[in-house]
Amino acid sequence: VSYPGFYVSAGMIDAHPALVAVSPQAPVGDWYFDDFLHNGAFFLAHAYRWLGGNAQERAKPTAERSPPIAYPTQDGYQLFLDAVSNDNVSKQHLKAAVPFWDEMMAHPNRDEFWQKRAILPHLKKVAPAVMVVTGWYDAEDLYGSFKTYQAIEELNPNVNNVLVVGPWHHG
């Protein structure tokens, strides 16, 4: 689900013949339209919470999770209001520990940075049967699910490709 759904999408491209079925679930399809940017609109609170707890740089590989990023106030609205800018959010609260945050801020438009990270145009040479799964209440990656299904349909017309959509949220 989500990032692992993206990995499933990557793994089905020119896959080993023994792989007969895959199921990308709530996959990211294009970083500019999914997850933290919805058609370019920055999903601030979600990006802060998720990246702060999952995307911090580590000095070496570890099985330990990073501690979640601190919230200096229980009022999330006030936290972002006091920060004034997204640059200050990074400096004051994330302590520049989340490089992807700074990369997103440096690329507010769908430029080459975002385009080269999109997996959708690469969903060619897919041989396994595919079942893309998503939920109508997925706030993060609904775009990626539909676009992954669509890309597989268009780029691999002979592949058994189905879309399952239900009344659930992300994952």
For each of these PLM feature ranges, what is it?
Residues V1-A10:
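Glycine-rich nucleophile elbow surrounding the catalytic serine of serine-hydrolase chemistry
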Residues Y3, S23-Y32, V165-H170:
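Active-site nucleophile loop of the alpha/beta-hydrolase fold
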Residues A21, A129, N160-V162:
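Proline-centered loop/turn at the N-terminus of a beta-strand
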Residues W136-D138, W168:
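Acidic beta-to-alpha connecting loop that harbors the catalytic carboxylate
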Residues A139-F146:
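Conserved alpha/beta-hydrolase "acid-adjacent" motif
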Residues I152-G171:
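Catalytic histidine neighborhood in serine/cysteine hydrolases
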